[in-house]
């Protein structure tokens, strides 16, 4: 037990307390015992760096305040919904996973929009409080992040868009069909 604590202290000194905290949450459900294995900690550390890099380009703050894209709004609100539900179930490992998925999506979109990223900082603050507080001040806020309201999701951003599906015969794509997810069936005149 003493040896384990010493390794945790070494990890904390090398990667930071928030990386260690998130790694422990990411290991699995809190009610289950988990073997201590440090091989995955660099992945959590890389995730936090990737999150940080959404705000910075070559070490300089690089954020915009444009109208967010529909894809980035969907990613944000999907994450807020999932993390909120998972916190209520104390499913902290899936919260961390949801953050990772969101940051990967926003990185692919090259999102540096403060209207998307600010709520994400607030959302991650219970999981990585030191990281979130530092980032909060880096983007120009004067008050602590702890005073901010928890972000709420809006269902209008969670609606699935149309999907394209390839149709294949004998392993070769012949054509693509579209599934219109926003269509509804008429209910009047149905017997």
Regions found by a protein language model. Give the residues of each.
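Single conserved hydrophobic/aromatic residue that forms the stacking wall/gate
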Residues: 1-7, 11, 182-191
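Helix-rich, typically C-terminal accessory recognition domains appended to large enzymatic cores
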Residues: 12-176
